[in-house]
Amino acid sequence: HFGGVRGIITEAEVQAGTVQVIAPTGFMEEAISENVYAGNAMSRRAGLQYGRVIPSSPFGQVDSAIGKGLAVGTTGLIAPTLVIEDDFEEHIIDGVRIIFQNTPGTEAPAEMNAWFPQQKVFWAAENITATIHNIYTLRGALIRDALVWSKQINEALYRYGVQAEVMVSSHNWPRWGNERIQEIMRAQRDAYANLNNQVLNLANQGVTINEIHNEYEVPLSLQQQWNVRQYHGSEFHNSRAVINRYLGYWDGNPATLAPLSPADSAPLYVEMMGGADAILDRAQALHDGGQYRLAMEILNKLVYAEPNNSGGKDLLAAVFEQLGYQYESASMRNVFLSSA
């Protein structure tokens, strides 16, 4: 999260020492790891997640959850001049006292909060926004640790949240008033903790990575709080991410351990289902009956088996469109509508 730095400062100002660039420990290493090593693939996937290719409209891109859309401009990076190494580290910058809290393993591998005691302002970085965030981001990144995330919010709550009069973050709007700030911090802490703990509880009972998104439910007490609704992250991909973090992508079924590629297995499915026409007829009926996920299952096989089948592709696009409209998460909506 560094691309806009040259929009507010110059390299010359940094070299002259008139401006400091302050970053958490490990920032440069993680910036390169996340954005360069898999940069091409991540960029392609980001276009899906943020709806880059679809027009802004009620039937297209309406939001990116923690922002209205991707910024377009020149990306730049300036190396930090001050790296925060300790868990908690205090500095005075231009007469302003700041206590930095390193929060590795939360929204990013290298991240930090900041407390301004004179002003009673808590900067929550991207650890607390106006939505549940991503444990797994659909553009691609390392899986985040929901339990560590909840613990870091809890630490911040009892160190700074109990005193704060204003809370700001890198996305969305400020929050004013101590009571409201504590309410939001507790809800965010509890949401990530519940996600981690309940998914692991279900996993230990035998629920797999390919089933968990249909089993995990956010508690009603959290569903009723706006600040932890599923506008960015969602229970669907976040629940799978928790299992992936602890157990990996394999579901324990030998049939999925070294499977055929979809394009190699799909022709047999199409043959066994009676061919393309039979699939199209059944998929249309499923679509018309609102059973979009079932329609997607069989149409996906057809499109892999017959990539030039325009009827199959058009109907699958219609299914994706209807699914996109139904998801609260802007990320999931954008993926389905972009793919359509």
PLM regions: where:
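Active-site HxH/HxHxD metal-binding segment of metal-dependent hydrolases
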Residues: 1-80, 85-86
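Divalent-metal (often Zn2+) His-rich catalytic cores of metallo-beta-lactamase-fold enzymes
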Residues: 121, 131, 147-211, 215-250, ...
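Alpha-helical segment of the N-proximal tetratricopeptide repeat
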Residues: 266-301
